[in-house]
């Protein structure tokens, strides 16, 4: 279906800065308390955010996980291999300055939300089966929990119907209620799944990361089952989606 191409992903703060690797410059990683927060240390020095701010984390669990990401770097530091560090940096560096724009970027996905598209059952029966299995319960949860009724499109349609203003208002309220940490997680999950419905369901514990992955990839999974896996393409995409959604889920839970 062509709706996947209708919206490009806005660049994250890390992407705008660039994500070039650099040599590892430290030997030891650890964590310590910083008042009511936790911080990661590299050779006993506090780790700052990319913008130079203090990386003050709300839980020991998150600090340990980010320290583990830094400890796992071998000869070179690869930012792409540290999704939790990226989320924390986004929450601290980007969102306080660009909160309204971040919310706007997330809400824009309502118009082309993955869960709103319906395949023609006669032409794509397996895609349609998976859409009904995964998307309908998420939309029902969104309607019941947040009062946002994202109407599904006609079977085979390339565009979803206009988003009801009441639904957009409800989604706006849901985003506004989130902390900066949770908004960072929602942004990542929404951009990866191309669905604010899936993102909110993941943060709301209606689905887990595995369920979010299945809902986000109904077309890809059906096509792989029919035509087979293309190594170096499908497997790479699956790994990326899996890591990003699992990281968003963990990050949201560790900052609750």
Q: Where are the regions a protein language model picked out?
A:
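N-terminal mitochondrial targeting presequence
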Residues: 1-21
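Short N-terminal "domain-start" leader segments
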Residues: 24-33
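Short aromatic-glycine-(Arg/Gly/Cys) micro-motifs in beta-strand/loop hairpins
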Residues: 32-48
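A surface-exposed, charged beta-strand/loop segment in the N-terminal or early-internal portion
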Residues: 45-119
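Internal, conserved structured core segments that host functional sites
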Residues: 100-170
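An internal, amphipathic alpha-helical element
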Residues: 161-231
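Long hydrophobic alpha-helical segments typical of transmembrane helices together
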Residues: 213-256
């Amino acid at each position: 279906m062509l709706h996947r191409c209708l919206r490009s992903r806005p660049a994250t703060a890390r992407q705008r800065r660039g994500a070039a690797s650099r040599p590892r410059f430290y030997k030891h990683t650890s964590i310590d308390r910083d008042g009511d927060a936790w911080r990661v240390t590299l050779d006993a020095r506090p780790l700052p955010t990319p913008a130079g701010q203090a990386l003050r984390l709300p839980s020991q669990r998150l600090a340990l996980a980010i320290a583990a990401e830094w400890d796992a770097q071998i000869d070179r530091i690869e930012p792409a291999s540290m999704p939790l560090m990226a989320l924390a940096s986004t929450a601290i560096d980007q969102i306080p300055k660009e909160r309204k724009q971040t919310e706007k970027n997330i809400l824009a996905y309502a118009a082309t939300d993955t869960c709103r598209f319906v395949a023609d059952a006669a032409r794509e029966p397996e895609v349609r089966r998976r859409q009904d299995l995964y998307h309908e319960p998420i939309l029902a949860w969104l309607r019941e929990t947040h009062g946002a009724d994202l109407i599904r499109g006609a079977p085979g349609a390339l565009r979803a119907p206009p988003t009801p203003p009441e639904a957009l208002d409800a989604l706006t309220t849901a985003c506004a209620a989130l902390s900066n940490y949770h908004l960072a997680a929602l942004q990542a999950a929404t951009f990866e799944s191309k669905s604010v419905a899936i993102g909110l369901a993941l943060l709301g514990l209606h689905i887990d990361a595995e369920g979010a992955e299945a809902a986000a990839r109904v077309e890809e999974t059906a096509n792989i089952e029919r035509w087979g896996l293309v190594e170096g393409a499908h497997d790479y995409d699956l790994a990326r989606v899996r890591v990003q959604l699992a990281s968003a889920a963990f990050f949201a839970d560790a900052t609750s």
